[in-house]
Amino acid sequence: MSTAVTAREIASELYQAYNSHDTAAVAQLYAEDSSHVDVAHGHPKLGSSEISEGLGKFFQWFPDAAWDVAQIISADSDHVAVTYTLKASLQAAMGPVEAHGQKISLRGVQVLTLRDGKIQRSEDYWDAATFQKQLSFNTKEI
């Protein structure tokens, strides 16, 4: 029986670290020369340190961020997809957007490519229009 960590286990550890807001644990899961891209923004983060720093900024804006993982789908030993719903509320100004506790609920899919037991590349797919609408037009009912 192999003691190697599976792609599904790495994905599960990643989302546990996200939900614990543990940026150091996230950085440890990524290879030093890795990349992460939020496809909706198109600006990649390069390297585990930059990925961790970007996530830290996200947690400043959304300190209550929580991911509800619906599925972890493993294609093979080096590729896995995670479907999730992210729920959070904006608590700090994000560029021109002032924080008024606007709630967001975003469904997304993150595709992870692994190499040697580390995340080499992650691509996160979610709808930017939904995100922007929720930040701009949220009401207390949402």
Please tell me what each predicted stretch does.
Residues M1-I142:
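C-terminal and inter-domain tail/linker signature
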